[in-house]
């Protein structure tokens, strides 16, 4: 209780602090290494390899671990027999999605967008300084971040669409059974 005798609402903590840590850690590691690497390394190859490796680890962790745990979504892309790209989505049911921790979800989405914005800004700096080689590093990292943004955004929309279809089918079937039972009694 506070001095004014008002009851304070409980502060919601992160439900999955380790997952949140690794979700942020790999993004931060890739960005920090890229930004600070010029101070410690003269070799573009080392900077390229380590930065892209950290960004790839971030991509994998977000796509396969933190996306599933923090927001209940997972996506992947397959090439079918006709050579067409097919998006596949997994999501928790709507009830489970509604129970997801709001802080975890907030952290997931904001860091996803902020990391992409940071890579974009670094790309602009590379353009201004006429560093095409560093623009390549930024382009790879930005592409990985944008792929996750697109994948998870499509997955979230697909989950909402599936819920709406399920709700309309449930309502229609209940209405149909109510109408049938009404006519059966007559």
Swiss-Prot record:
Per UniProt, the keywords (alphabetical) are: Acetylation, Endosome, Golgi apparatus, Membrane, Transmembrane, Transmembrane helix
Q: Which GO terms describe its biological process?
A: Golgi organization; plant organ development; protein secretion; unidimensional cell growth; vacuolar transport
| UniProt keyword Transmembrane helix present | yes
Location in the cell reads: Golgi apparatus, trans-Golgi network membrane; Early endosome membrane
Provide the positions where the record notes the PTM N-acetylmethionine.
1
What GO cellular-component annotations does this UniProt entry give? early endosome membrane; endosome; extracellular region; Golgi apparatus; trans-Golgi network; trans-Golgi network membrane
| The organism's place on the tree of life at top rank | Eukaryota
Q: What happens when the gene is disrupted?
A: Severe size reduction of all organs. Abnormal cell wall composition.
What sections of the protein cross the membrane?
Answer: 35-55, 108-128, 132-152
- UniProt key word Membrane: yes
User: How is this protein situated with respect to the membrane?
Assistant: Multi-pass membrane protein
Complexes and interactors = Component of a trans-Golgi network (TGN)-localized ECH/YIP4 complex made of ECH, YIP4A and YIP4B. Interacts directly with YIP4A and YIP4B.
Q: Which PANTHER family match?
A: GOLGI APPARATUS MEMBRANE PROTEIN TVP23
Regarding protein family, the annotation reads: Belongs to the TVP23 family.
Job of this protein = Mediates trans-Golgi-network trafficking and cell elongation. Required for keeping the appropriate balance between secretory trafficking and vacuolar targeting of a subset of proteins. The ECH/YIP4 complex is involved in the modulation of the trans-Golgi network (TGN)-mediated trafficking of some proteins and cell wall components (e.g. pectin and hemicellulose) to the cell wall in dark-grown hypocotyls and in secretory cells of the seed coat.
For this entry, the protein name equals Golgi apparatus membrane protein-like protein ECHIDNA
The organism named in the record is Arabidopsis thaliana (Mouse-ear cress)
Instruction: Tell me the classification of the organism that encodes this protein.
Output: Eukaryota, Viridiplantae, Streptophyta, Embryophyta, Tracheophyta
- From the UniProt record, report the name of the gene that encodes this protein: ECH
